[in-house]
């Protein structure tokens, strides 16, 4: 039932941005700030950001044939419809320069670190559509009941107890489809039920109040 997933862009969109730099000033400051060299740490999330902005610095070069003097990083925001902390408009209305101003505001970096940067925003209207509320009948099974030659693979098939928005979900859907249709005598890797872990539940409870 596609309408369960594509009927509300405001509830299912993020905005991302890609930044291209011609010098190492920003990466040098980030390494000093985080203690991690590019490509060795995870996301840097600004928890007090109205946009809930995150960035990640990849190991460089990130692209094939990327020039030695070029550095690239990526970021995104979960609430692009909200007014920024340092830019008085929603991210969805911002230019690349506005986004960089907001980013440097959170980092307390001088704008000179990115004054020659190219920042390209990208709106992703259905990026989290697979998380939209749904009925159990809104997603098909990877192999529908009684099907002999038809299967579905995607983030929009029904796999009980699994979590969407992961590579593993897509792989598991494909494995189920292939193994069932072709009678492959092999077990699909089991799903880790982290929601049943008392440690995970306790950590989530603590995090909710900190």
Language model features with spans:
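Acidic, Ser/Thr-rich low-complexity intrinsically disordered segments
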Residues: 196-210
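C-terminal segments that line or cap access tunnels to active or ligand-binding sites in enzymes
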Residues: 1-194
